[in-house]
UniProtKB/Swiss-Prot annotation:
HAMAP family: DNApol_clamp_arch. One of its GO terms (molecular function) is DNA polymerase processivity factor activity. It comes from the Archaea. InterPro entries: DNA_clamp_sf (IPR046938), Pr_cel_nuc_antig (IPR000730), Pr_cel_nuc_antig_C (IPR022649), Pr_cel_nuc_antig_N (IPR022648). Keywords: DNA replication, DNA-binding. Belongs to the PCNA family. This is DNA polymerase sliding clamp 2. Pfam families: PCNA_C (PF02747), PCNA_N (PF00705). Coiled coil: none annotated. It comes from Sulfurisphaera ohwakuensis. Homotrimer. The subunits circularize to form a toroid; DNA passes through its center. Replication factor C (RFC) is required to load the toroid on the DNA. Sliding clamp subunit that acts as a moving platform for DNA processing. Responsible for tethering the catalytic subunit of DNA polymerase and other proteins to DNA during high-speed replication. GO terms for biological process: leading strand elongation; regulation of DNA replication.
Length: 248
């Protein structure tokens, strides 16, 4: 049997909300090292990964690795009741799926829900193996604002890096938008191994960057015409990772 307790029901809710932008059904994989879920869109343009490493789980018991397919909306119904930072969430395997308990550690109030789930093997989807020659970290709100501005002008964004600057630009119907990102203006970190350039869908980027607002330390990586990687961590240890395929 499986039992896992995560310290922040609110963060768990935020992470699942990010997944819900891509799919409403996931396989929660329980392994010795972590709880995770991976999903690739049918067009193979976007992959999203939800992960909570074992070290960030307050209580984790697992007899054997197992996947449980669930509907995210069913899980969000109870997680939406977590109004304070002191609320924890516990997942317990049942014969029919999962028992989910949200408990406010300050007040002692508790809510339970039983979710139907199909038990499966661990999914074998793997992340792209590419060399990200450019990485930078910034506040998720900044990325959301940039994506919004890009979407007002064009459908594709070219992201490039050279020397000490990352540039996001789009041009369409005589209109141009360009955003220049540098260390401390507003980047918290910047590493450029070599000049790089790639083009991505603004619509996909906008959807992903809406999710980044849950974190103040979002790390973006890209290279020459390879998938972009966006890592969105939470203070409680859980994270979302997005991979966006380039337009070639």
């Amino acid at each position: 049997m499986i039992k896992a307790t995560y310290s922040s029901a609110k963060d768990f809710y935020s992470l699942l909300s990010g997944l819900l932008r891509v799919t409403d059904e996931i396989i929660l994989n329980f392994t010795e090292d972590s709880i995770f879920s991976r999903y690739l869109t049918d067009d193979k343009v976007l992959m999203v990964i939800f992960k909570i490493p074992k070290e960030y789980l307050e209580d984790y018991t697992i007899d054997k690795p197992l996947g449980i397919k669930i509907n995210i909306n069913d899980l969000k119904k109870i997680l939406g009741k977590a109004k304070t930072k002191s609320a924890t969430v516990t997942l317990e395997e049942t014969e029919a799926g999962l028992k989910v308990t949200v408990r406010d550690e300050k007040t002692g109030t508790r809510s339970n829900i039983y979710i139907k789930g199909e038990k499966t093997s661990i999914d074998q989807l793997t992340e792209p193996k590419v060399n990200l020659s450019v990485t930078f970290t910034t506040d998720g709100d900044i990325l959301k604002d940039i994506a919004r501005d890009l979407s007002l002008v064009g459908e594709e964004v070219e992201i490039s890096a050279d020397e000490n600057t990352v540039t996001l630009s789009t041009e369409e119907a005589g209109r141009t938008y360009k955003s220049l990102l540098r260390q401390d203006k507003p980047l918290k970190s910047l590493n450029i191994e070599s000049p790089s350039k790639a083009v991505y869908s603004i619509e996909v980027l906008k959807d992903v960057f809406k999710v980044t607002t849950i974190s103040q330390n979002v790390t973006v990586g890209f290279g020459n015409n390879i998938p972009m990687r966006i890592e969105v961590p939470t203070d409680s240890g859980g994270q979302l990772i997005f991979w966006i395929a380039p337009r070639l």
